[in-house]
Amino acid sequence: MTFSVDKVRADFPVLSREVNGLPLAYLDSAASAQKPSQVIDAEAEFYRHGYAAVHRGIHTLSAQATEKMENVRKRASLFINARSAEELVFVRGTTEGINLVANSWGNSNVRAGDNIIISQMEHHANIVPWQMLCARVGAELRVIPLNPDGTLQLETLPTLFDEKTRLLAITHVSNVLGTENPLAEIITLAHQHGAKVLVDGAQAVMHHPVDVQALDCDFYVFSGHKLYGPTGIGILYVKEALLQEMPPWEGGGSMIATVSLSEGTTWTKAPWRFEAGTPNTGGIIGLGAALEYVSALGLNNIAEYEQNLMHYALSQLESVPDLTLYGPQNRLGVIAFNLGKHHAYDVGSFLDNYGIAVRTGHHCAMPLMAYYNVPAMCRASLAMYNTHEEVDRLVTGLQRIHRLLG
């Protein structure tokens, strides 16, 4: 199948709008991606004609809604090549998935004197839950340091492991730098030291295929809204043997087997014991449509197009005076930069006046900002619906801002 960016763009209604009298150039998909009509229509159709509470309902609408929900679990398992759909838990997003692991597996397996390893490039969602766990139990948090080029100092990693290391939690792709970490060698090393591995895949799954069996990670988590799906829905993958051992994190309906005031409560089996309460069924339906959409386009086709676009963007940005780029030459999805000594917010505001949407701030990565000694960065992210013309507009906009601000 030949990838056609024009055909893809036609599926995204918002891309036809104007901002400040100019065509929208949406370069903020790493924060949240836009939604194709196929996703919008699937969720709307469910609410119009198929909505009902799932599980245990004997009537037709409930049974059909339950079947649709579980079919999305199956589709998601195929999307990341899990062994079984029952290794996947529906969560609100990457943040909740990581917190679930920290509060369920972490509380049961991390003790005083143990340690957890993260990296200096992590999103706060893959830092704060582990800080909280370490504070609760008296464990130590260890950090893989950064190199100036935005890669990790992996030569230091063997020295961070010891017999007390319980977990390595690491991002697949940095949300600021675009660095893709060499997970295969990292995971192998962690397992050699008896540690489990959690991978934050929020910035990876939309850019190329992910195979959790080939990676051999113990946990993998991602959000639907960055994958052209709805907000409020994500996937947590856990190896089946681990998932079966994990206690529930939240209590309520749907996750129980029996409830007795005198004899206590027993849990249903995984993954459903981690899905307390009424699920975001509409969001799940929308996620299924998003998975179907990108799978039909072909993730390898998407990857090839996006990499060509990234190479073009990096080459064109060389023409912008006083532009500082952060991250390695080989990267996925994002370009973080600052223009001279101007604050990122000012640069982003000027770009918005030109109809160009970028993200500004610390990007939920304050330790990374501290490493580069800056309060904020601008970040342009490139998705499958972005074009060479939009890159040209970004470059022209930055050149114009440089002339205006000096």
UniProtKB/Swiss-Prot annotation:
<keyword id="KW-0808">Transferase</keyword>
<protein>
    <recommendedName>
        <fullName>Cysteine desulfurase</fullName>
        <ecNumber>2.8.1.7</ecNumber>
        <ecNumber>4.4.1.16</ecNumber>
    </recommendedName>
</protein>
<dbReference type="InterPro" id="IPR015424">
    <property type="entry name" value="PyrdxlP-dep_Trfase"/>
</dbReference>
<comment type="function">
    <text>Cysteine desulfurases mobilize the sulfur from L-cysteine to yield L-alanine, an essential step in sulfur metabolism for biosynthesis of a variety of sulfur-containing biomolecules. Component of the suf operon, which is activated and required under specific conditions such as oxidative stress and iron limitation. Acts as a potent selenocysteine lyase in vitro, that mobilizes selenium from L-selenocysteine. Selenocysteine lyase activity is however unsure in vivo.</text>
</comment>
<dbReference type="GO" id="GO:0030170">
    <property type="term" value="F:pyridoxal phosphate binding"/>
</dbReference>
<dbReference type="InterPro" id="IPR010970">
    <property type="entry name" value="Cys_dSase_SufS"/>
</dbReference>
<feature type="modified residue" description="N6-(pyridoxal phosphate)lysine">
    <location>
        <position position="226"/>
    </location>
</feature>
<comment type="subunit">
    <text>Homodimer. Interacts with SufE and the SufBCD complex composed of SufB, SufC and SufD. The interaction with SufE is required to mediate the direct transfer of the sulfur atom from the S-sulfanylcysteine.</text>
</comment>
<dbReference type="Pfam" id="PF00266">
    <property type="entry name" value="Aminotran_5"/>
</dbReference>
<keyword id="KW-0963">Cytoplasm</keyword>
<dbReference type="GO" id="GO:0031071">
    <property type="term" value="F:cysteine desulfurase activity"/>
</dbReference>
<dbReference type="GO" id="GO:0006534">
    <property type="term" value="P:cysteine metabolic process"/>
</dbReference>
<dbReference type="InterPro" id="IPR000192">
    <property type="entry name" value="Aminotrans_V_dom"/>
</dbReference>
<dbReference type="InterPro" id="IPR015422">
    <property type="entry name" value="PyrdxlP-dep_Trfase_small"/>
</dbReference>
<comment type="similarity">
    <text>Belongs to the class-V pyridoxal-phosphate-dependent aminotransferase family. Csd subfamily.</text>
</comment>
<feature type="active site" description="Cysteine persulfide intermediate">
    <location>
        <position position="364"/>
    </location>
</feature>
<comment type="pathway">
    <text>Cofactor biosynthesis; iron-sulfur cluster biosynthesis.</text>
</comment>
<dbReference type="GO" id="GO:0005737">
    <property type="term" value="C:cytoplasm"/>
</dbReference>
<dbReference type="InterPro" id="IPR015421">
    <property type="entry name" value="PyrdxlP-dep_Trfase_major"/>
</dbReference>
<keyword id="KW-0456">Lyase</keyword>
<keyword id="KW-0663">Pyridoxal phosphate</keyword>
<dbReference type="InterPro" id="IPR020578">
    <property type="entry name" value="Aminotrans_V_PyrdxlP_BS"/>
</dbReference>
<dbReference type="GO" id="GO:0009000">
    <property type="term" value="F:selenocysteine lyase activity"/>
</dbReference>
